[in-house]
Amino acid sequence: MEDEEGPEYGKPDFVLLDQVTMEDFMRNLQLRFEKGRIYTYIGEVLVSVNPYQELPLYGPEAIARYQGRELYERPPHLYAVANAAYKAMKHRSRDTCIVISGESGAGKTEASKHIMQYIAAVTNPSQRAEVERVKDVLLKSTCVLEAFGNARTNRNHNSSRFGKYMDINFDFKGDPIGGHIHSYLLEKSRVLKQHVGERNFHAFYQLLRGSEDKQLHELHLERNPAVYNFTHQGAGLNMTVHSALDSDEQSHQAVTEAMRVIGFSPEEVESVHRILAAILHLGNIEFVETEEGGLQKEGLAVAEEALVDHVAELTATPRDLVLRSLLARTVASGGRELIEKGHTAAEASYARDACAKAVYQRLFEWVVNRINSVMEPRGRDPRRDGKDTVIGVLDIYGFEVFPVNSFEQFCINYCNEKLQQLFIQLILKQEQEEYEREGITWQSVEYFNNATIVDLVERPHRGILAVLDEACSSAGTITDRIFLQTLDMHHRHHLHYTSRQLCPTDKTMEFGRDFRIKHYAGDVTYSVEGFIDKNRDFLFQDFKRLLYNSTDPTLRAMWPDGQQDITEVTKRPLTAGTLFKNSMVALVENLASKEPFYVRCIKPNEDKVAGKLDENHCRHQVAYLGLLENVRVRRAGFASRQPYSRFLLRYKMTCEYTWPNHLLGSDKAAVSALLEQHGLQGDVAFGHSKLFIRSPRTLVTLEQSRARLIPIIVLLLQKAWRGTLARWRCRRLRAIYTIMRWFRRHKVRAHLAELQRRFQAARQPPLYGRDLVWPLPPAVLQPFQDTCHALFCRWRARQLVKNIPPSDMPQIKAKVAAMGALQGLRQDWGCRRAWARDYLSSATDNPTASSLFAQRLKTLQDKDGFGAVLFSSHVRKVNRFHKIRNRALLLTDQHLYKLDPDRQYRVMRAVPLEAVTGLSVTSGGDQLVVLHARGQDDLVVCLHRSRPPLDNRVGELVGVLAAHCQGEGRTLEVRVSDCIPLSHRGVRRLISVEPRPEQPEPDFRCARGSFTLLWPSR
């Protein structure tokens, strides 16, 4: 921090002042303000002065400078406080809150915006879509709530007219997962009337000035706010503080877009605009006395009934009911009889105003609840997702003193008294009491305790709110003057209360109207006029029923209490003051349960002028905020305190005497040894149960040592844990394998027993178990089952063939080979007849030339030395020249011969059998065979001149050739096709079969590029 801010900028922390006096404090504050340094620390409390101008202190670059840094490492800034709260939440799993306080116009709302922007910028590094959605809603909600809850006042151009406390929920990684907004005491009386120089809520002016002409026409509105009673006071004013802020026209578009991003449907946005327009029209309704009857009860009428039409249309309610609700009210008598009582003009005006205030309040509450419904964390389970942590941001109205202060200012200032009391308890009172309790020597600091002022307001039975509630609940006529007299009677001796009756010489107060409270921030005179009425916050049930019965679902949802029966007797509702007191008590309890961070905002001048600091005005704020006392406590106190056990739990790994567990006499002794090893014992004090650390630098030193050791410890723990997991896994696997082994044994035994039972009769001929159904094996036994099935098939085949004579085995093997080669693609392949193989040597097939063939066969055997004849038959062949000849085919174990039967079976062609690579046949009953040989033309033949005629011998040729190839260990390629491709001298041709009934014997027909076998069909 000192590197970036030199002495010319003053002290960045008021604790560093040489002398703690008001003069030194103000001198340092003014110097820093003049140098553009609007932020200054008091320890961890940030003092912020509103500059009333844009300063280059914000944005992504500034966020990067403060992200992850300690408070003292950078100049004072809102980002530093936001970062400290975020780190405390993320690293220590502590719920934290940032309390932003100060009077109206001190810059609290802007401070809360910058805090939200910082949190949104530093979270969700992994860009999760759900987290981005939540961040967008958090940021956009501020824009929407400002439109409906902020207004221009004489002290602030963008004053929050409601209190806001926002909880932001974070997951264990520190990413926002949701949030919740609590609103407090909307100043709904502003809807009706504003002081000179002030405006109504921004939403009305944004609607009138930012809507398109078409939308204004549909809403029956004019663009000029001066036309409407509720907005004419501020019609000539704008919401802008200076030229950098958006105008009403631009803000309307920004708010509409923000509502869309948050999740408001187009219908809901339209309903909101209609409700705002209805309120404006309602404010223009005037009542006049007439002599007519009918709906205009007792001579009361609406001056301009077109306004009633507009209100009825915009609220989606019947016109007659709207008019009746304005002119009269329904009362249930004791006998549950309904009586309609007409209003006077004054009563009707009161009812109209009460309705307008209530509708706007319900609209604001609905907007807040709608935003909350979008922001609520979804699907969170602490057992699965871990504990959520929270950062709360409190932006609530500041202390207010107006020329005329009413019930709203009384509640606002009571709220500030409660927050000041919390600040005193947490920062001043509790701190000093803890030092005394722990036996820490220090210099006591005197401070003003405002508990007596809080007690004056909220004390049961005698407090101002209790007296006000009693006045509201009394059966008789109790006026505001009587209420004031009761206050005077109860508090005439109270040091912080006075009135004109108690102090007749004080002519600044009006007799019978004013009382004064000496607040911690100064004296405020309150006018009791309207106190009872505003506290009752009464609205006739007729309006509630009217709006509940609206056909607009958005408006209807705002009035659930309108559904109760008109004759139903209900409990008296809590008053506005009591509700506000209860909400303040709950808020303070909520804040007290969190680790607080404070931003104390100071308003530099009443003129809202940049660069001007009114010393007297600021001195007064410094005094009532207790900042000087805070400096004294901070200088005399300690930056941090922790129980010894918690301190050891976090830092014990930084000392050899305390890691992993110490053996010293007590935690206090262990902490002392740890600090002594680091050389930090001079900056701490030892209490009875806690360690008090004076400087934040000591904590940072310990945190840095811890951060260096954490990766090593994590690796050690990971190694140990992974080893444990591996051992657990190993033991489980061993147990699993043992169970699997025994289970498999059981399943194998059971399966084998079942197989044995089923196959007891498998040896019985002639089926040998062919009809037996195999049991379904377990998956693990499937390979075993497959092996058993293969063995069974081999055994059964053996049983079937063992009785076949050895002489028939070659024929059986050939048939098996043919069946495998043809794969069932040929209709008939002669498996049912006996295969003779050598048909040319048979006198039956070759009666005239069998002896001649035998001589030729002997000659070839002597010449080529083959061992056996595999197949022989007469064939009819066609060659590449389209010549058709009768030939003989001889297949031996070494050669394939083509013989000429007309020339004593002379050899026309001899092909080595090893060159034959395959053959092609058709799927029909014809005898066409195409033999394929390596490096030779394909041989196209048709088996011919068989006995009986047209006997099917193709399967026999395929079988003997395939069986021989299997015996040699090579594969014969057999193709079955009705259109067979063949090759002659490299020319591709096709051959097909054409059955002909009139064909006497097989023959070939040649065409260009193809052949056709003409086959006699039987």
Swiss-Prot record:
<feature type="region of interest" description="Actin-binding">
    <location>
        <begin position="584"/>
        <end position="606"/>
    </location>
</feature>
<dbReference type="GO" id="GO:0031256">
    <property type="term" value="C:leading edge membrane"/>
</dbReference>
<feature type="domain" description="IQ">
    <location>
        <begin position="710"/>
        <end position="739"/>
    </location>
</feature>
<dbReference type="GO" id="GO:0031589">
    <property type="term" value="P:cell-substrate adhesion"/>
</dbReference>
<keyword id="KW-1064">Adaptive immunity</keyword>
<dbReference type="Pfam" id="PF06017">
    <property type="entry name" value="Myosin_TH1"/>
</dbReference>
<dbReference type="InterPro" id="IPR027417">
    <property type="entry name" value="P-loop_NTPase"/>
</dbReference>
<dbReference type="InterPro" id="IPR036072">
    <property type="entry name" value="MYSc_Myo1"/>
</dbReference>
<dbReference type="InterPro" id="IPR036961">
    <property type="entry name" value="Kinesin_motor_dom_sf"/>
</dbReference>
<dbReference type="GO" id="GO:0051649">
    <property type="term" value="P:establishment of localization in cell"/>
</dbReference>
<keyword id="KW-0547">Nucleotide-binding</keyword>
<dbReference type="GO" id="GO:0005654">
    <property type="term" value="C:nucleoplasm"/>
</dbReference>
<keyword id="KW-0112">Calmodulin-binding</keyword>
<comment type="function">
    <text>Unconventional myosin required during immune response for detection of rare antigen-presenting cells by regulating T-cell migration. Unconventional myosins are actin-based motor molecules with ATPase activity and serve in intracellular movements. Acts as a regulator of T-cell migration by generating membrane tension, enforcing cell-intrinsic meandering search, thereby enhancing detection of rare antigens during lymph-node surveillance, enabling pathogen eradication. Also required in B-cells, where it regulates different membrane/cytoskeleton-dependent processes.</text>
</comment>
<dbReference type="GO" id="GO:0072678">
    <property type="term" value="P:T cell migration"/>
</dbReference>
<dbReference type="GO" id="GO:0002456">
    <property type="term" value="P:T cell mediated immunity"/>
</dbReference>
<dbReference type="GO" id="GO:0016459">
    <property type="term" value="C:myosin complex"/>
</dbReference>
<dbReference type="GO" id="GO:0005546">
    <property type="term" value="F:phosphatidylinositol-4,5-bisphosphate binding"/>
</dbReference>
<dbReference type="GO" id="GO:0030048">
    <property type="term" value="P:actin filament-based movement"/>
</dbReference>
<comment type="subunit">
    <text>Interacts with calmodulin; via its IQ motifs.</text>
</comment>
<feature type="binding site">
    <location>
        <begin position="102"/>
        <end position="109"/>
    </location>
    <ligand>
        <name>ATP</name>
    </ligand>
</feature>
<dbReference type="GO" id="GO:0005547">
    <property type="term" value="F:phosphatidylinositol-3,4,5-trisphosphate binding"/>
</dbReference>
<dbReference type="Pfam" id="PF00063">
    <property type="entry name" value="Myosin_head"/>
</dbReference>
<keyword id="KW-0007">Acetylation</keyword>
<dbReference type="GO" id="GO:0005886">
    <property type="term" value="C:plasma membrane"/>
</dbReference>
<dbReference type="GO" id="GO:0006887">
    <property type="term" value="P:exocytosis"/>
</dbReference>
<dbReference type="InterPro" id="IPR010926">
    <property type="entry name" value="Myosin_TH1"/>
</dbReference>
<dbReference type="GO" id="GO:0030175">
    <property type="term" value="C:filopodium"/>
</dbReference>
<keyword id="KW-0391">Immunity</keyword>
<dbReference type="GO" id="GO:0005737">
    <property type="term" value="C:cytoplasm"/>
</dbReference>
<dbReference type="GO" id="GO:0001891">
    <property type="term" value="C:phagocytic cup"/>
</dbReference>
<keyword id="KW-0518">Myosin</keyword>
<keyword id="KW-0966">Cell projection</keyword>
<keyword id="KW-1003">Cell membrane</keyword>
<keyword id="KW-0446">Lipid-binding</keyword>
<dbReference type="GO" id="GO:0000146">
    <property type="term" value="F:microfilament motor activity"/>
</dbReference>
<comment type="similarity">
    <text>Belongs to the TRAFAC class myosin-kinesin ATPase superfamily. Myosin family.</text>
</comment>
<dbReference type="GO" id="GO:0038096">
    <property type="term" value="P:Fc-gamma receptor signaling pathway involved in phagocytosis"/>
</dbReference>
<dbReference type="GO" id="GO:0006897">
    <property type="term" value="P:endocytosis"/>
</dbReference>
<dbReference type="InterPro" id="IPR001609">
    <property type="entry name" value="Myosin_head_motor_dom-like"/>
</dbReference>
<dbReference type="GO" id="GO:0051015">
    <property type="term" value="F:actin filament binding"/>
</dbReference>
<dbReference type="GO" id="GO:0120117">
    <property type="term" value="P:T cell meandering migration"/>
</dbReference>
